[in-house]
C-alpha cells in the first residue's frame, strides 16, 4: 500500500494489533525491555510483524513504543540503534504484502510541567530524537499513540512536524468516563490535534470496542472532514488473570458498529493477536467507510475545558495592565501571584475565556507573556486569549499553550496579516481581526466591514476557516464619538450575517469618561448581544454585566432550562436602595459570600504563593496542628472528593497538592523554630516494580500522601524485590505501595509481594496501575487495590490514621 492510499477512504485501512502481549507469549522474559526485541530476538519480532501483515494489516507499527532516551537509559544501546533495528524488522515483514511501516511512539513516562517536572521543550527534544531516527531508518509515517496528556501530545506533534515530512497519526487513551487519565476531553483532543496538523486522529487502548464507540462518535463529529479517524481498542475488558474477555469473533462483531460512524481505519491494541486482525479484515473488507460529517463549530479549549462559542461568551478582561497599577507592578516585578488570583476570581465570577496581555513599556513582552501563560495554565482551566500584536511574543506563547487559544489580534495591515496569520495556522489558534488599518478606525460601518472582509479573505488564504475568525468592529467612547456606537453595532451585525464569522467587542470602552459607567456598559452589552455579539471582553466581577449575560442566555434559549441562571441566582436576594447619584442601585446579597478560611481557599484553588502567605498568617494566631487539621487536610479532602466525582481533574489535584506543600513548609519552619518534634502519621514505602519504567502514577501518589502528613520513601522505578524488602525492614513501614503499568511487569509485582511475605514483615501491600483490577490484585497476593492517588490516601488514613 502506498501511504497516500491511507487517506482516500475508498476502503477500510487495517492497522495491526497488540505487540507487548505477543512478545510475552513468544518468549519475552519478565524485566526484559520490549523495545530491545529487535536486537535480542529479531526473528521473533519479524515473525510477529509477518503474522500481522499476512492477517491483512496495511500498517505495521514498529516495536518502538518506548524507544526514547529516558526509557532506554542504561540498556547499552542508543535510540538510533534501537529504532533502526526495529524499523528494519517491520520493513522485512512488510516486503511480501506491501504494508506501510509506522514509527510507533508512546508517552515518555513523565508528567509535563505544571502537573509534573518535565519541561515542554525537554519533552519536545526527546520526541524529536526518536522521530529523526525513525525518518532516517525509512519509516512511512509517525504514529503517536496511547497518549493521556494533551500537552505531551502537542510536544510530540510539533517534534514530528518540525523534524520530518512524514504523515502524523495521533491517538489518545480514554477512561470509561470519557476523559483521559489527566482529564482531557475527546473534543479538546480532536480540535487541538487537528489544529496542530495531525493527518489522522484516533483512540486506542484502555477499553474495548463497545466502550470506546461513543467516544469515537464524538471524535468523528469534532475533527475536520478531511482528517481520517481510526480506532485500536483492546480485546474487550481485562479478566482477573490479565487476559481479555473477547475472542476474535466477538471483537469483530463489536467493531462492526464503527463502519457506520465515519471511522475509516481499524485495528487492535492490548490482548489482540493476528487472529483478531484477520477476523477484522474479513468483516470490514466488503464494507466502505461511511461519510464522516463533522460539526463545524467555533471553539476554544484547554485539555479539561471545551468552550463552544455558540452564543454569548464572556472573556475576562482583568489580566491587562492598562489602567491597573497593581497588575502593572506585578508584571514589572515578575510576580505571578497577582495575575493568578485575578484569573481564579474571574473564573469563579463566570468568565469562560481569559484575556492575557503583557504589553508594557520597559519589559520583555515575549518573555513575560510566555511566563504568564505557563503560570495561568497552572491555576485555571479556562482557555486563554493571547492579547498581543507582537509576533515573537505570540510565537512563544502559542508554542507552550496547552489546547486551542485565540489570538487578539491582527488588523487590516498587510504586514500584520503576513506575520501573525501563519502563526495562528501553525498552532491551531483562532484569531481576532480588528476593523482598522493604517488609516485608523473608519467612522462608518461600511468602512469597518470592508476591512473585515480583507481580514477574512487573508485568513482563509492562510488556511484558517471562518469558524476560527472573530471580527472586532471596535467600541468607541460615547463621550467622544456618540454616533460611533450605532456604527459599531451595524458593522458587527453585517460581519456576522454576510461574512459568516464570529464577533468580539471590548464592551467597557463605551463608557470611558462618563459617570455611572455600569449603566452604559450594561445597556451597550445588551444591544451588542442583540446584534449578534459572540465574545464579550468585559469585567466578569461586575454583577450587573454578568446578570445581563445570564438573563440574555435564558431569553434566547442558550441556557436550556435556565440551569446556569438558577445556579447563579437561586439564593440571591435583591435589595433596592436610594443613592444620591441615581434612582436606585441593585446589590446582590449572598451571591458570593467569601469563605472565612484563606488557607483552605488558597489550597483548594491551587494558589501556591497565597497558600504560603495564608499559612504564615494563620500560624500567628493558631497552633501548627490546628492549621493542618482545620485548614489543610479539609482542603485536600475537598479537592480529592471533587476528583472522585469527576469535577476536579489531575492537574488541579496536583496544583492543590503543590499549594498545600508550600503551606506545609511554613508549618515545618514554625515547628522547628519552637523546638518541638515534627510528627509523622506513619511511614510508607512506594516503588515501581522491576522492569517497569513508568512512574507517573506512583509519583502522584507520593505527592498526595506526603501532603497528608505521611513519611514516604520513594524507591523510584525498575526496583528489585530485594530493595523493597530491605527498605521496609529498615524503616519499619506498615504500608507498601507497588505500581506497574505493563502486563509484562505484573509478574515482578507478584514476586515483590511474595518476597515481602517470605520476609515475614508486618506490613500491608497496596497496588495500582493501568493493567490491574481488584480481582487481579487479589490473585497476585496484594492486600489492597487502589485505582488512583485519592484511593491510596483514603487507605492510608484507614490503616495508619
Predicted regions and their residues:
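Domain-level signal for soluble alpha/beta catalytic cores
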Residues: 1-801
Amino acid at each position: 500500500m502506498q501511504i497516500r492510499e491511507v487517506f482516500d477512504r475508498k476502503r477500510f485501512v487495517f492497522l495491526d494489533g497488540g505487540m507487548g502481549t505477543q512478545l510475552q507469549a513468544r518468549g519475552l522474559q519478565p524485566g526484559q525491555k520490549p523495545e530491545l526485541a529487535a536486537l535480542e530476538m529479531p526473528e521473533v519480532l519479524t515473525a510477529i510483524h509477518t503474522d500481522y501483515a499476512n492477517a491483512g494489516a496495511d500498517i505495521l507499527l514498529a516495536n518502538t513504543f518506548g524507544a526514547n532516551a529516558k526509557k532506554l537509559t542504561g540498556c547499552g544501546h542508543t535510540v538510533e540503534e534501537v529504532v533502526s533495528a526495529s524499523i528494519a524488522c517491520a520493513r522485512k515483514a512488510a516486503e511480501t504484502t506491501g504494508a506501510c511501516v509506522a514509527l510507533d511512539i508512546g508517552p515518555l513516562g513523565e508528567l509535563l510541567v505544571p502537573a509534573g517536572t518535565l519541561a515542554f521543550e525537554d519533552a519536545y527534544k526527546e520526541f524529536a530524537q526518536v522521530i529523526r531516527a525513525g525518518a532516517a531508518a525509512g519509516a512511512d509515517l509517525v504514529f503517536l499513540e496511547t497518549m493521556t496528556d494533551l500537552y505531551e501530545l502537542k510536544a510530540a506533534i510539533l517534534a514530528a512536524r518540525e523534524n520530518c515530512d512524514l504523515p502524523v497519526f495521533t491517538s489518545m487513551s480514554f477512561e470509561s468516563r470519557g476523559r483521559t487519565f489527566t482529564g482531557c476531553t475527546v473534543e479538546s483532543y480532536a480540535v487541538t490535534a487537528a489544529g496542530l496538523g495531525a493527518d489522522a486522529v484516533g483512540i486506542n487502548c484502555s477499553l474495548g470496542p463497545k466502550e470506546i464507540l461513543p467516544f469515537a462518535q464524538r471524535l468523528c463529529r469534532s475533527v475536520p472532514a478531511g482528517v481520517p479517524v481510526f480506532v485500536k481498542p483492546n480485546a474487550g475488558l481485562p479478566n482477573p488473570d490479565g487476559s481479555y474477555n473477547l475472542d476474535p469473533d466477538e471483537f469483530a462483531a463489536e467493531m462492526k458498529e464503527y463502519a457506520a460512524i465515519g471511522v475509516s481505519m481499524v485495528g487492535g491494541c492490548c490482548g489482540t493477536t493476528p487472529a483478531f486482525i484477520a477476523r477484522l479484515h474479513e468483516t470490514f473488507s466488503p464494507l466502505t467507510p461511511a461519510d464522516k460529517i463533522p460539526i463545524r463549530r467555533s471553539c476554544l479549549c484547554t485539555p479539561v475545558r471545551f468552550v463552544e462559542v455558540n452564543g454569548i461568551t464572556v472573556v475576562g478582561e482583568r489580566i491587562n495592565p492598562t489602567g491597573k497599577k497593581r497588575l502593572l507592578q506585578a508584571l514589572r516585578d515578575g510576580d505571578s501571584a497577582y495575575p493568578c488570583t485575578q484569573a481564579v476570581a474571574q473564573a469563579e465570577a463566570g468568565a469562560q475565556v481569559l484575556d492575557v496581555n503583557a504589553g508594557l513599556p520597559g519589559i520583555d513582552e515575549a518573555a513575560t507573556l510566555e511566563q504568564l501563560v505557563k503560570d495561568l495554565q497552572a491555576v485555571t482551566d479556562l482557555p486563554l486569549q493571547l492579547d498581543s500584536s507582537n509576533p515573537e511574543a505570540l510565537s512563544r506563547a502559542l508554542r507552550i499553550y496547552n489546547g486551542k487559544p485565540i489570538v487578539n489580534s491582527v488588523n487590516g495591515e498587510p504586514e500584520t496579516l503576513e506575520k501573525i496569520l501563519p502563526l495562528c495556522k501553525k498552532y491551531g489558534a483562532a484569531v481576532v481581526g480588528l476593523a482598522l488599518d493604517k488609516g485608523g478606525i473608519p467612522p462608518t460601518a461600511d468602512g469597518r466591514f470592508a476591512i473585515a472582509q480583507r481580514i477574512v479573505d487573508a485568513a482563509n488564504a492562510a488556511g484558517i476557516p471562518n469558524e476560527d475568525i472573530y471580527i472586532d468592529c471596535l467600541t468607541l467612547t460615547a463621550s467622544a464619538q456618540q454616533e460611533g456606537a450605532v456604527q459599531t453595532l451595524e458593522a458587527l451585525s453585517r460581519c456576522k450575517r454576510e461574512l459568516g464569522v464570529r464577533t468580539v467587542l471590548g464592551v467597557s470602552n463605551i463608557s470611558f469618561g462618563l459617570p455611572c459607567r455600569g449603566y452604559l456598559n450594561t445597556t451597550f452589552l445588551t444591544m451588542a448581544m442583540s446584534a449578534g455579539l459572540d465574545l464579550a471582553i468585559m469585567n466578569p466581577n461586575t454583577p450587573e454585566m454578568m446578570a445581563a449575560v445570564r438573563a440574555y442566555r435564558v431569553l434566547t434559549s442558550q441556557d436550556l432550562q435556565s440551569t446556569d441562571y438558577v445556579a447563579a441566582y437561586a439564593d440571591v436576594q435583591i435589595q433596592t436602595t436610594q443613592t444620591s447619584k441615581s434612582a436606585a442601585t441593585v446589590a446582590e446579597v449572598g451571591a458570593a459570600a467569601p469563605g472565612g478560611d484563606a488557607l483552605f481557599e488558597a489550597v483548594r484553588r491551587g494558589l501556591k504563593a497565597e497558600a504560603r502567605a495564608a499559612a504564615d498568617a494563620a500560624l500567628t494566631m493558631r497552633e501548627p496542628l490546628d492549621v493542618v487539621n482545620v485548614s489543610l487536610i479539609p482542603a485536600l479532602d475537598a479537592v480529592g472528593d471533587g476528583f472522585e466525582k469527576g469535577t476536579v481533574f489531575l492537574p488541579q489535584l496536583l496544583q492543590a497538592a503543590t499549594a498545600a506543600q508550600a503551606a506545609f513548609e511554613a508549618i515545618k519552619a514554625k515547628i522547628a523554630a519552637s523546638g518541638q518534634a515534627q510528627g509523622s502519621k506513619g511511614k510508607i514505602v512506594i516503588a515501581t516494580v522491576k522492569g517497569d519504567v513508568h512512574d507517573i502514577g506512583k509519583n502522584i501518589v507520593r505527592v498526595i500522601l506526603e501532603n497528608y502528613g505521611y513519611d514516604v520513601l520513594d524507591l523510584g522505578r525498575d526496583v528489585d524485590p530485594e530493595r523493597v524488602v530491605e527498605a521496609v525492614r529498615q524503616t519499619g513501614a506498615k504500608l507498601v505501595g507497588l505500581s506497574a503499568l505493563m502486563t509484562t511487569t505484573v509478574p515482578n509485582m507478584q514476586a515483590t509481594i511474595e518476597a515481602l511475605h517470605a520476609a515475614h514483615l508486618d506490613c500491608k501491600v497496596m497496588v495500582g496501575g493501568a493493567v490491574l483490577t481488584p480481582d487481579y490484585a487479589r490473585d497476585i497476593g496484594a492486600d489492597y487495590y487502589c485505582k488512583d492517588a485519592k484511593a491510596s490516601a483514603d487507605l492510608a488514613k484507614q490503616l495508619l490514621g
